[in-house]
Structures are given as C-alpha cells and as structure tokens.
Amino acid sequence: MSDPARKSFTEQGKEKMTPDSSKSTLDKAKESITGAYDKVASAFTSDEDKSTSQEAHDKAQRFVDDKL
C-alpha cells in the first residue's frame, strides 16, 4: 500500500503495462506530472516517515535509478 498523496502501486503498474500508443495525450501528461510529483515526494520524505512497503518500493526505485 502506498502512502497518502503518493501514486498507488496498482496505478504505477497499470501505467507501465499500458502501451503509450493506446494512451491519450492527456493520459501521458497526467502520468508525467504525477510521476514527477511522486519522485519529489519520495525524495523529500524520510524513510522513517514512510510505511514499510513504501520505503521498500522507494529504495528499489532509487537502486534502479542509480543503475540507469
């Protein structure tokens, strides 16, 4: 379960599974904006203030981001 005001894990999964070719311009813009907000929220919220699942997800995402 994601923390309040963060993108749910289900929503993130759906966005990744849906091909861009089947998304509207508005959907793509919304995903981009909410994704950027989620990344900022992840960076500015300390791991101690996150739920266990959100902390694990953010750590995994940071690991992936560092590898790219």
Swiss-Prot record:
Q: Which Pfam families match?
A: HSP9_HSP12 (PF04119)
- Entry protein name: Heat shock protein hsp9
Name the protein family: To yeast HSP12/GLP1 and C.albicans WH11.
Q: Taxonomic lineage of this organism?
A: Eukaryota, Fungi, Dikarya, Ascomycota, Taphrinomycotina
The alphabetized UniProt keywords are: Stress response
Q: Which residues form the signal peptide?
A: none
Biased composition regions of type Basic and acidic residues, renumbered to the chain: 1-18, 47-68
Q: State whether keyword Cell inner membrane applies.
A: no
The record lists the organism as: Schizosaccharomyces pombe (strain 972 / ATCC 24843) (Fission yeast)
Regions annotated as coiled coil: none
GO MF terms listed in the record are: lipid binding
Q: Where is this region: Disordered?
A: 1-32, 44-68
Classification via Gene3D superfamilies: 6.10.280.100
What induces its synthesis? Strongly induced by heat-shock, nitrogen limitation, and upon entry into the stationary phase.
Q: What InterPro entries has UniProt attached to this entry?
A: HSP9_HSP12
